[in-house]
C-alpha cells in the first residue's frame, strides 16, 4: 500500500508525536534528523585504540552502519528519541538500579511499537520504521543529544538538566518527514569533576 503524502504541517505532527510519547510513559522525547553522527570521530578513535576488545560486531560492517544513522534502516529520515527514567535515586544495593525491573529492552520496545502504530493511524497509511533499544547499530546517545535531550557528561553519559542520567534511551526511526529539535549544544559540566573523583576504579 503506497504511503500517504506528508501532511501540510509536519511541525504539528511532530509535536503530536512527542506529546504521545509522553502519553505512553516516556519521560523525555525529542526528534533528530538521521545522518552522520557528530561523535563519529570519537567513535573511530575508540575503535582504532582497540577499546572494543572482543566485541567484533562493533568493527567492520558494524562500524560502517554506525557511521551514518541512515544506513541501518534505509529510507528512514528522522528518529523520535525517547528516555525512560529507571529510578536511579533508589537506595543502593547488590543489584544495579537499572536491572531491578523488567527487561528495559522489551519495556521500551513495546512503547515504541505502540507509538509507531499510533503514528500510522495519524497519517492514515503504513509508515516504514523500526524501534531501537540498545540493540542495533545506532549511536543512541549522539542521536539523543541531537534531539535536544541532554549533553555528554564527563562520565560519558547523556545528562539531562532536569533528570540527570538515570534513564534508558530508545529511538523510533521513521521514513517520514518530521521537524528536528535543536541539538543540546551547551556543556553544563564546566569545571565540575565530582563523577571523576567519586569513581572507585578511576574508569574515566
Regions found by a protein language model. Give the residues of each.
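Residues immediately within or flanking Cys/His clusters that coordinate Zn2+
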Residues: 186-192, 196
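Iron-sulfur cluster-binding cysteine motifs and their immediate structural context
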Residues: 23-26, 194-204
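Auxiliary alpha/beta "docking" domains used to position bulky ligands
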Residues: 1-188
Amino acid at each position: 500500500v503506497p504511503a500517504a503524502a506528508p501532511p501540510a504541517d509536519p511541525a504539528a505532527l511532530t509535536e503530536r508525536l512527542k506529546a504521545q510519547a509522553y502519553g505512553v510513559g516516556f519521560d523525555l522525547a525529542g526528534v533528530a534528523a538521521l545522518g552522520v553522527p557528530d561523535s563519529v570521530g570519537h567513535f573511530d578513535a575508540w575503535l582504532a585504540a582497540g577499546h572494543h576488545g572482543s566485541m567484533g560486531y562493533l568493527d567492520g560492517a558494524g562500524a560502517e552502519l554506525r557511521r551514518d544513522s541512515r544506513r541501518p534502516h534505509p529510507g528512514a529520515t528522522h528518529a523520535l528519541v525517547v528516555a525512560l527514567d529507571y529510578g536511579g535515586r533508589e537506595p543502593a544495593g547488590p543489584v544495579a538500579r537499572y536491572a531491578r525491573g523488567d527487561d528495559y529492552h522489551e519495556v521500551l520496545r513495546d512503547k515504541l511499537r505502540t507509538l509507531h502504530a499510533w503514528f500510522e493511524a495519524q497519517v492514515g497509511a503504513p509508515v516504514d520504521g523500526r524501534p531501537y533499544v540498545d540493540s542495533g547499530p545506532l549511536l543512541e546517545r549522539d542521536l539523543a543529544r541531537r534531539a535536544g535531550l541532554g549533553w555528554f557528561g564527563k562520565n560519558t553519559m547523556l545528562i539531562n538538566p532536569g533528570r540527570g542520567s538515570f534513564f534508558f534511551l530508545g529511538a523510533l526511526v521513521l521514513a517520514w518527514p518530521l521537524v528536528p529539535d535543536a541539538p543540546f549544544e551547551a556543556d553544563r559540566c564546566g569545571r565540575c569533576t565530582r563523577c571523576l573523583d567519586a569513581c572507585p576504579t578511576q574508569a574515566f
